[in-house]
Amino acid sequence: MTRHQKRLAVPNSWPVERKTNTFTVKAGAGPHGEAGVPLVVLLRDVLGYVDSTKEARYALNNDSVLVNGDAISDEQRPIGMFDILAFPERGEFFRVFPDEGGRLALTSVDEEAAGSRLGKITNKSVVPGGDAQLTLHDGTNVLVDADTEYDTKDSIVVDNESKDVVAHFEYEEGALVTAVAGQHAGRIGEVADIDVTLGSGSNTVFVGDDEDGYETVEEYLVVIDENFTGDDADEVDSDE
């Protein structure tokens, strides 16, 4: 199986320039599905820390790159929305956050903020033993007590070291959300109204106020809090 794909064919969320080289690295198996960006692309094309896949492999083999608190050895490992990228030797930490164009961007955060990651609950099920299993937007699972009140569309914050849930944000009117897809991707605001659609259609949500609000479908929204807006952080852009 090829390890490369044409740049023109990559998802719109990838932070790469499509009109330079013909090919780029293909994402390997892992979280985030097809939307995941290979780690080497962020290291090379966005941060400029390496010039080649070979240099990326060397850095990874020396445990100098952590993703959600774990050392990563595969340069093709998919990186996606709300992942935490840490470079302990450099003292640099980043959160993956969608920009207003819908492309994934790296937002600089401090070490404390880098100790946990946000996840949107996409499914909840009961597993043998009676615990509840929460499936997050990136495909990872978290076990919690069955009697805890977590619902799909809510968001949780997971500690990168203990893997425990340390915060819970309910999806409801008044919740702070960000759009992660569609024409309003990257925009942040409070849920003003949820218009429930009967049948299998998507619910429509109005975010913000009448003057500067927007309407989108429910699936495009993720509940966050003020610590995830990036208001006080610097965004790293790819070289284009």
Swiss-Prot record:
Q: Which Gene3D superfamilies match?
A: 2.30.30.30, 2.40.50.740, RNA-binding S4 domain
Instruction: List the GO molecular function terms.
Output: rRNA binding; structural constituent of ribosome
Q: Name one GO cellular component term.
A: cytosolic small ribosomal subunit
Q: Which UniProt keywords apply?
A: Ribonucleoprotein, Ribosomal protein, RNA-binding, rRNA-binding
Organism domain of life: Archaea
- Write down the InterPro entries for this protein, in alphabetical order: Rib_uL2_dom2, Ribosomal_eS4, Ribosomal_eS4_central_region, Ribosomal_eS4_central_sf, Ribosomal_eS4_N, Ribosomal_eS4_N_CS, S4_RNA-bd_sf
SUPFAM superfamilies on file: Alpha-L RNA-binding motif (SSF55174)
What does the similarity note say?
A: Belongs to the eukaryotic ribosomal protein eS4 family.
Q: What is this protein called?
A: Small ribosomal subunit protein eS4
Gene that this polypeptide is encoded by = rps4e
